[in-house]
């Protein structure tokens, strides 16, 4: 069981597209594995978040605001995982499906969870001089998401998968930014 979990993480990190074709990964245990991967990456994400906040404070860009406590960060991150999966499901399955697309929401949710595996390497960002590594890890995450979405939605090219995978976080981030700006006004 733990071996299967590690196998999923390693195959996702290696961008192995056969991970997403294996029906055994989409059973009930697959959903729980993806949930555990997301929670682990959220816990690890606190390291670069703290480094980023201290860097922003040194530059004078973060003044007086308190960072999110862990419970709120966990809840918000799980909510964003769910919203991102809904967005990818609606756009990829309902709006722009391929003729061979036969996918349910749970499969998309599980795939997005598996794609979070490269974010485990965020623990390496422990110093502000390493902050640019977040970009590399994020590109790796988007690549894993593109491979997964391309396989489960049976797209012929990866451009469609990239647009769906990359636009979802951008729309969510922009929406949250607008929401927080309106709340602070």
Task: Pin down the residues of each PLM region.
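Short alpha-helical linear motifs
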Residues: 32, 57-61, 129-135, 160, ...
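Hydrophobic alpha-helical transmembrane segments and adjacent short intramembrane/lumenal linkers
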Residues: 89-176
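Selected alpha-helical membrane-embedding segments in polytopic membrane proteins
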Residues: 1-103
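Juxtamembrane boundary at the C-terminal end of a transmembrane helix
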Residues: 173-185
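Transmembrane helix-loop junctions in multi-pass membrane proteins
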Residues: 47-59, 120-129, 182-183
């Amino acid at each position: 069981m733990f071996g299967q979990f590690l196998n999923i993480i390693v195959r996702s990190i290696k961008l192995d597209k056969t991970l997403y074709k294996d029906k055994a990964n989409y059973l009930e245990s697959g959903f729980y594995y993806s949930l555990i991967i997301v929670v682990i990456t959220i816990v690890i994400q606190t390291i670069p978040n703290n480094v980023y906040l201290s860097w922003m404070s040194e530059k004078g860009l973060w003044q007086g605001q308190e960072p999110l406590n862990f419970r709120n960060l966990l809840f918000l991150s799980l909510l964003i995982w769910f919203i991102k999966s809904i967005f990818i499901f609606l756009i990829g399955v309902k709006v722009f499906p391929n003729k061979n697309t036969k996918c349910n929401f749970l499969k998309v949710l599980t795939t997005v969870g598996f794609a979070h595996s490269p974010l485990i390497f965020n623990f390496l960002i422990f110093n502000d001089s390493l902050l640019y590594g977040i970009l590399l890890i994020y590109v790796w995450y988007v690549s894993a998401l593109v491979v997964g979405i391309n396989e489960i939605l049976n797209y012929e090219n990866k451009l469609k998968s990239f647009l769906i995978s990359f636009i979802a976080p951008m729309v969510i981030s922009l929406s949250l930014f607008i929401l927080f700006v309106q709340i602070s006004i």
